[in-house]
């Protein structure tokens, strides 16, 4: 499990809002130039589809979600403390019945 906080970072004040406010995140920039987003996904009635441009590792901080990566036909369940990886130039579908906190590690 990763640390509960990030030190020595810059946080972009303007939020990233997706799907009418069902997903809201903030970009965090590190001294070495890497970026992550810290976000929340509210309960969904249907899966939310996100496209990736760079590889991403989604770390679940609290809650649980069902995820389909790329063309997968099966959903996989992820809970707090777990992560899933999505290749660059791909997509994933995510749904949750509860508030989901996450860190998206942009790895490209």
Swiss-Prot record:
One of its GO terms (cellular component) is cytosol. Its EC number is 2.4.2.1, 2.4.2.2. InterPro entries: Ppnp, RmlC-like_jellyroll, RmlC_Cupin_sf. Keywords: Glycosyltransferase, Transferase. Pfam families: Ppnp. It catalyses: a purine D-ribonucleoside + phosphate = a purine nucleobase + alpha-D-ribose 1-phosphate; adenosine + phosphate = alpha-D-ribose 1-phosphate + adenine; cytidine + phosphate = cytosine + alpha-D-ribose 1-phosphate; guanosine + phosphate = alpha-D-ribose 1-phosphate + guanine. It comes from the Bacteria. GO terms for molecular function: guanosine phosphorylase activity; purine-nucleoside phosphorylase activity; thymidine phosphorylase activity; uridine phosphorylase activity. It is an enzyme of class 2 (transferase). Belongs to the nucleoside phosphorylase PpnP family. Catalyzes the phosphorolysis of diverse nucleosides, yielding D-ribose 1-phosphate and the respective free bases. Can use uridine, adenosine, guanosine, cytidine, thymidine, inosine and xanthosine as substrates. Also catalyzes the reverse reactions. This is Pyrimidine/purine nucleoside phosphorylase. The gene is ppnP.
């Amino acid at each position: 499990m990763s640390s509960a906080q990030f030190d020595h970072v810059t946080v972009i004040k303007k939020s990233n809002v997706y799907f009418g406010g069902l997903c809201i995140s903030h970009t965090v920039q590190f001294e070495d130039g890497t970026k992550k987003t810290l976000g929340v996904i509210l309960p969904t009635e249907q899966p939310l589809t996100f496209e990736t441009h760079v590889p991403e590792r989604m770390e679940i901080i609290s809650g649980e979600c069902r995820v389909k990566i790329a063309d997968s036909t099966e959903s996989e369940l992820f809970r707090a403390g777990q992560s899933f990886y999505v290749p660059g130039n791909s997509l994933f579908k995510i749904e949750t019945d509860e508030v989901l906190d996450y860190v998206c590690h942009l790895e490209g």
